[in-house]
Amino acid sequence: MELLSLSQAVAQQLDRLDFSALYPGYHRFPFALYNEERVCLEGQLFPWDDRFLGNTSIEYEGQRIAIWSVALDPLPPVSLAASMAHEMFHCFQFDQGEHRFPDDLRLLNAPAEQDFYQLKLAENCALAIACRTGDAAEFRRFAALRNERAAHFPQIAAEEWKAETIEGMAETVCLRALRVLDPAQYAEALACYLAKLENELPLLFDARRLCYYTGTVLCLTLERLGLPFYNDFTGTTLYEQNRPTDALCFEAPEVPALAALFAEHLKEQQTTLAAHRQARPFHPCEAAICGYDPMNMFRLDQWLYCSHFLFIRQDGAAQQLHGPVLAQLAPGSDYRIIGYYCCLLYTSPSPRDRG
């Protein structure tokens, strides 16, 4: 569908939504669809420029707008309208003084310990069951397992809960919009999310992506159980504001398949890093990371692998390193590098951070 026609079709679907019913006080924001050549912002067409990157919320000429790349993520109008409700909620979060953003690079630094993932899988399964069945005991079991994991791995848990707060809340709004626009598609999407938590073991190793699903299912479980929902934008994370206070102690069952998958996952990462180091030259470089694609990167020890791109800042100038790029982090740092393996780079006046 042509860009203007698609934008009009999405706008018609958005007209069907009562935004304040999706979330108290929430309202519609301007949106733009774009491809490699053109942008359509609220029915107005103009040439694309590099302010339009990814699917996110940006500040554009003094106002917050939601943007979506129809070239990278083509969707039919109903699905795209629901997705725009997600991105518009990011605009709303900024307006409400949201501050609970995760540290993406710290979120990558998950412990290379099987127990961490064993607990994570058990808590995800309990959450999925609670959402599907409305069983309050399973919700308390989920909270107990999560609290246990957080006690052993507090730093990574804190970043996960922040990511859940930002992305899970926005994705909840997306699914609530879909529930209005196409109830059958909503039911299918929710079933898919629950299946991901219970069965998609590789997703355990993609912390940021997983938080989209855990945060959404957490919100929908509270809704299913008829529990009060708290989300003070200037307060603690979504989970901390809504976790049950009577959670008991539970043990995570062993899952043999997870042990094998965990070993395979580590081996694949090690192989990727070794092949990259062998195939590309090393460039010594003391610089700060200033932009990245959080959905397409991983970290192993002091190595940060970015399949798409990485922006660094050195002596006040920003550079884009074209992916794949492998950066060597400075000892004890999540944001400073001492060099990288990469073929190409170019100077850019405006590095792009995550959205």
Please place each PLM-identified region on the residue numbering.
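Short, hydrophobic/proline-enriched secondary-structure or compact coil segments at domain edges
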Residues: H27-Y34, W303-Q319, C343-L345
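Post-HExxH zinc-binding segment in Zn-dependent metallohydrolases
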Residues: D95-R140, E160-Q185
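Conserved small/polar residues in nucleotide/adenosyl-binding loops
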Residues: Y346-G355
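Pan-zinc metallopeptidase signature
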Residues: Q155-A317
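Active-site scaffold of zinc-dependent metalloenzymes
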Residues: F46-P77
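Active-site recognition of the HExxH zinc-binding catalytic motif
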Residues: A82-F94
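Active-site-adjacent bridging/hinge elements
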Residues: Y60-I65, A137-H152, A187-K196
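N-terminal mature-domain "stem" immediately C-terminal to a signal peptide or N-terminal signal-anchor/transmembrane
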Residues: M1-E42
